[in-house]
Design a protein with these regions (language model features):
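Conserved N-proximal alpha/beta basic substrate-recognition cap immediately N-terminal to
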Residues: 1, 5, 13-119
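Active-site "cap" helix and flanking loop/linker of ATP-utilizing ligase/carboxylase catalytic domains
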Residues: 10, 277-297
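A short acidic (Asp/Glu
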Residues: 20-27, 59-67, 138-141, 177-178, ...
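Glycine-rich phosphate-binding loop of ATP-grasp-fold ATP-dependent ligases
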Residues: 107-108, 127-151, 178, 201-220
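ATP-grasp fold ATP-binding core
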Residues: 111, 121-142, 160-173, 254, ...
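A short acidic-Thr-Gly-centered motif at the start of a beta-strand
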Residues: 113-125, 158, 244, 255-267
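Phosphate-binding site of ATP-dependent enzymes
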Residues: 151-206, 257-271, 279
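A long amphipathic alpha-helix within ATP-dependent nucleotide-binding catalytic cores
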Residues: 191, 203-266
Length: 297
């Protein structure tokens, strides 16, 4: 998978040279300038820049075991900062400032106690509870107005380990989409592209459309005027730079949706989730840019 989005001149880490023939064939066919780095070779180099799908303590420890130097890896303090900023509370806080005008809606609540969780669930016919340190459709609990023993136990466990639970209403979703960004590690976060994706009935990621940014905007502007997406992306560059620009280096994505309200009006939910890591939207962007003809549909 990394070969599809790796920068030219990069190497993809694999367990052994078993993958070399596959990488060579694809590189020649698609013009990719990507080499193979096996796990035993990690210790032979120095001053490498590792760019994983996403950082976590287990990966850091694994690379150290393979011989990567301390200076090539993020510090333990950085890992703690990254975990804090990957928390869904960041999206809850950001959402109100992204409801820019009448085309934007959406609510999200951070619930810190079982009493708050119970009141939220029982105050709605249906709702969705999310574990704060989860993503890609995982850590979700769909509720139907009854705070059952199972839901209570789930909330208690999640709150004890992750600080709380995020509660959201159920939306009449029309389209899932995202805006992808790149943080340069020097304070600036810039727009990288759009993505349209699909999820299953439980919210799990199912796949991405391969489309150019222009065609994605055409698709989305059937629901909301195109200028509103431009307005939102500009605001997000500012907000994300303030939130993450000072420490984070790499790709990130903001999941969104078009939903239809009770008056049959289409609205943008501008911040369903923030993914402070690489994501399949970035892969779809790179595949579209490298492999699709301009008139592909």
């Amino acid at each position: 998978l990394p070969m599809w989005y790796a920068e030219a001149g990069s190497a993809v880490l694999a367990p052994s040279a078993y993958n070399a023939d596959f990488l060579k064939t694809k590189s020649e066919l698609l013009g990719m300038d990507v080499a193979l780095l096996t796990e035993p070779e990690v210790a032979d180099g120095k001053d490498r820049k590792f760019s994983p799908w996403g950082w976590d303590p287990a990966l850091r420890k694994r690379l150290m075991t393979l011989g990567a130097g301390q200076t090539e890896l993020p510090s333990a303090d950085y890992m703690n900062i990254l975990r804090e900023h990957s928390h869904r509370l960041q999206a809850v806080k950001l959402l109100p400032g992204l409801r820019l005008n009448e085309y934007f809606c959406g609510e999200s609540f951070y619930l810190s106690t079982l009493a708050e969780c119970s009141a939220f669930v029982e105050g709605r016919e249906a709702c969705l509870l999310k574990a704060p340190l989860s993503g890609s459709g995982k850590g979700l609990n769909w509720c139907k107005g009854i705070f059952t023993t199972f839901i209570s136990g789930w909330c208690a466990r999640v709150a004890a380990s992750q600080g709380g639970v995020v509660g959201e209403p159920i939306y009449n979703k029309v389209e899932d989409f995202a805006m992808e960004f790149y943080a340069d590690g020097r304070g600036r976060v810039v727009f990288a592209g759009y993505s349209v994706f699909h999820t299953g009935g439980s919210g799990m990621y199912a796949g991405n459309d391969l489309l150019s940014d222009e065609k994605i905007l055409q698709k989305l502007s059937a629901y909301v005027p195109q200028e509103e997406f431009i307005r939102l992306r500009t605001r997000l560059e500012e907000e994300l730079s303030a939130l993450f620009g000072g420490f984070y280096h790499g790709y990130l994505g903001v999941d969104m949706m078009i939903y239809r309200n009770g008056e049959q009006q289409d609205k943008i939910h501008p911040c369903v989730e923030i993914n402070l890591r690489n994501n399949m939207g970035i892969v779809a962007l790179e595949v579209s840019r490298k492999c699709l003809a301009e008139d592909a549909k």
